[in-house]
Amino acid sequence: MKYILSVLVLIVFAGNSIPQDLPHNMTDKEKAEYKNYIPPVLQTDDTNPPPTPVRTMAEWEEVQGVIVAWTSYTTILRQIVDYVQDECQVFIVCSDSNSVKTFLTSGGVPLVNLKFIIAPFNSVWCRDYGPWAAYSGIADSLKIIDWIYNRPRPLDDNVPVAFANYASLPIYQATVSPNNLIATGGNFMVDGNGTGFSSRLIIEENPTKTELQIDGIMNSYMGITRYIKMNTLPYDEIHHIDMHMKLLDEETIMVGQYPAGVADGPQIEANLQYVLNNFQ
């Protein structure tokens, strides 16, 4: 079965460990640990790039599957499941599917188009560490793509492998030299036609690689032929572009608006002008 995978901005993974209320940024303890942190590498399929050219879909394209996970924010998640299951399959990652089913039915949500996955995790921020999907070939052969998560949270980092195993999909991991890439989903958007967007955090977090090498990895694993990188914002600690912008279609970018001269507003405007002036 073919899945088009969409990862929500807020996705919660519950599994074999007790979830921690870790923030989106690194804690002081994590910052100290990260200096000597060695990320996990689960070579379940291939740490080489896909063997044929791939295309990463845009978020506005039709989807066949959406991942949510069940630990907190359950009232909101129930609403998401209720609406999404009318349109496509919902993958619910949880520790106890029976309790999830009970909660859904108690809110009047029918148990249709649902799949349940068990996977451990460290934090709530699966938009940042979850799987990415890419396609190759005339038959749209789906592949899962995995990077190194930019947090010292090894269980989070293994969630893409858990999904790939469940869905019986090949996974290609940019986790081993020379293709090892530290990245985060919240700092990556794509237009479906080969153009990718990130803040320059992607360069800062890969100091052993040149920008050209980073572009090459993104091309090999994600099919990105034009990689636009914008300056980070002075007041946004995590520097994820999904905090202030979204691609709506091939020709439209939605950005956050501040009062004139306030906070991150001037840098957002400067970034927008940089894109408009250089990448038509």
Indicate residue ranges for each PLM-predicted region:
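The feature marks the mature, well-folded catalytic cores of soluble enzymes
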Residues: 20-280
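Bacterial Sec-dependent N-terminal signal peptides
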Residues: 1-21
